[in-house]
């Protein structure tokens, strides 16, 4: 339903476009984060830190985050992003993500940590897209 909500948002704002990101274009590296692989391949720039995406996101007033898994991939992506963008720029939709089974404690601690750093954490039903 996240894809449909993003598309509906686009339709209501003809001059704006939601930006969906794919990761792991290199099958020989592990990508937890969307921004970089765990061990970058020196011969493959797609495995290095994605500063194009970071700089693009820096221009946004609000960055709405959803995805899987909060304990691993999404969490690492957010950690990478908040090294360059203030956590207060982000809204984490807590009901649009979940941890890997058995890692619920890590996801809970992550949400608490990011909340203390200024990230808004809320359910998708609490988000008013008109404010974004």
What are these regions (language model features)?
Residues 1-132:
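Active-site-adjacent betaalpha module
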């Amino acid at each position: 339903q996240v894809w449909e909500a993003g598309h509906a948002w686009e339709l209501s704002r003809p001059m704006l476009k939601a930006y969906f990101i794919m990761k792991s274009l290199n099958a020989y590296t592990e990508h937890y984060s969307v921004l970089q692989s765990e061990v970058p391949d020196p011969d493959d720039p797609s495995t290095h830190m994605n500063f194009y995406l970071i700089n693009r996101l820096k221009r946004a007033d609000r960055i709405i985050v959803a995805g899987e898994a909060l304990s691993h991939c999404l969490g690492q992506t957010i950690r990478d992003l908040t090294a360059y963008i203030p956590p207060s720029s982000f809204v984490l939709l807590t009901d649009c993500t979940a941890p890997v089974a058995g890692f619920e404690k890590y996801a809970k601690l992550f949400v608490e940590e990011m909340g203390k750093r200024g990230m808004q954490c809320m359910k998708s039903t609490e988000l008013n897209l008109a404010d974004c």
